[in-house]
């Protein structure tokens, strides 16, 4: 189910800008790629990529792309409901719940995604590739698969008490 970005108060953060050069007879032609994360800090986050000859235009395109790829994140209080392992390519991210007051313990690109998703107390360990694109997508992959006890109970047709034992 697609999330309508116009109903959300989204904040954006540029995670990574890459410059590539095409060598031609007259010199080098530079183009830019921007990796952008958007989120409302209340359980919605998305990632997008924009490419252009100018950086601001690449960022604008990245924001538009990110708004099209929003996912909903299950949040319990200020943390995640359970430990989850996100994978994308060779990028692997382990996201773990943390007690209140811990803060966001995560490196670079992963931190941006977790903060814009609205998680205030969470730990994350980046395993495998440290490529920003793979790390961000692995984080999104993990967050999109999070489920609360209530969601699992509804899927199984049971009460929360039956699941928790």
From Swiss-Prot:
GO terms for molecular function: rRNA binding; structural constituent of ribosome. Residues 10-73 form the S5 DRBM domain. One of its GO terms (cellular component) is small ribosomal subunit. It comes from the Bacteria. One of its GO terms (biological process) is translation. SUPFAM superfamilies: dsRNA-binding domain-like, Ribosomal protein S5 domain 2-like. Gene3D superfamilies: 3.30.160.20, 3.30.230.10. The keyword Ribosomal protein applies. Keywords: Ribonucleoprotein, Ribosomal protein, RNA-binding, rRNA-binding. InterPro entries: Ribosomal_Su5_D2-typ_SF, Ribosomal_uS5, Ribosomal_uS5_bac-type, Ribosomal_uS5_C, Ribosomal_uS5_N, Ribosomal_uS5_N_CS, Ribsml_uS5_D2-typ_fold_subgr. Belongs to the universal ribosomal protein uS5 family. The N-terminal domain interacts with the head of the 30S subunit; the C-terminal domain interacts with the body and contacts protein S4. The interaction surface between S4 and S5 is involved in control of translational fidelity. Part of the 30S ribosomal subunit. Contacts proteins S4 and S8. With S4 and S12 plays an important role in translational accuracy. This is Small ribosomal subunit protein uS5. It comes from Clostridium acetobutylicum (strain ATCC 824 / DSM 792 / JCM 1419 / IAM 19013 / LMG 5710 / NBRC 13948 / NRRL B-527 / VKM B-1787 / 2291 / W). The gene is rpsE.
């Amino acid at each position: 189910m697609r999330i309508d970005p116009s109903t959300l108060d989204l904040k954006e953060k540029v995670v990574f800008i890459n410059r590539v050069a095409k060598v031609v007879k007259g010199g080098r032609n530079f183009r830019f790629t921007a990796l952008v994360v958007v989120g409302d800090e209340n359980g919605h986050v998305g990632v997008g990529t924009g490419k252009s000859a100018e950086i601001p235009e690449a960022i604008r395109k990245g924001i538009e792309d990110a708004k099209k790829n929003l996912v909903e994140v299950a949040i319990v209080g200020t943390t995640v409901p359970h430990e989850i392992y996100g994978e994308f390519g060779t990028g692997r991210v382990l996201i773990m719940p943390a007690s209140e007051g811990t803060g966001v313990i995560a490196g670079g690109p992963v931190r941006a995604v977790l903060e814009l998703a609205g998680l205030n107390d969470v730990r994350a360990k980046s395993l495998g590739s440290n490529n920003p694109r793979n790390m961000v997508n692995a984080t999104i992959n993990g967050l999109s698969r999070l489920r609360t006890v209530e969601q699992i109970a509804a899927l199984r047709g049971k009460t929360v008490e039956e699941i928790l034992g």
